[in-house]
Amino acid sequence: MTPLRELYDLYYYPNPAKEERRRQLLAEIPTDARDEENYGRTSLHIAAEFADCEAIASQLDRGAEVNDRDEEGHTPLFRLASRRSRVPALEEPIASAARLLLERGANLPRSARGTTALLEAVQNRHHAMAAVLIDSGQRLDSANSYGDNALHILCRRAADTAREIAGKERFIASFGERWVSEKQQREAREELEELQAEQMRCYATAALLLHSGQIAPDEKNSAGRRA
């Protein structure tokens, strides 16, 4: 196992007993070393993917290139945005990591090939990170290979959430017609509350995008569809 693969595994399978080893690897692995088994990613890509602000700062202080690309053309900022997690408690650390990368020179429009970290953040519902990116002063109107800008993607996400809300409301309405355990009822209501909160986050992000003045609400994508 290469040191970079070991580092990735220590992040993916966190173990307090191996915390010292993780820190040792971060201090010893050359900042330009690449994991050929993981798309040529560096230790900075890995630290960003797991929103580890301390490690991000240490790698940059050691000379890591903030806009270094892996074999897929992804920069550390994009790897951060690509993290798939719907755990609310992780959203602020992700946003803080994005802010740190931007402060150290991360380029938003050129954060990936055929897409950007903003598009990816919106796709993965990282609204706090999206707010940081929107506030960065960098270009926001980039589109992906389908011509979709951040508003197109956000509106699709909002529509997905609306469908999930409708389905959950139908399920809750059926409680009076069939037996459903108290645990299932409680979980369904909690899930509905979270979906409704997500819907409001979509609206707030849309407002930020429109207020930026960089994205027109009637702009069409490659298929001729508006947001």
Language model: regions and residue ranges:
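Ankyrin repeat A-helix N-terminal signature
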Residues: 10-17, 46-52, 79-94, 120-126, ...
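Charged, low-complexity interaction regions
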Residues: 177-181
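N-terminal segments that cap or nucleate solenoid repeat domains
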Residues: 1-59, 64-68
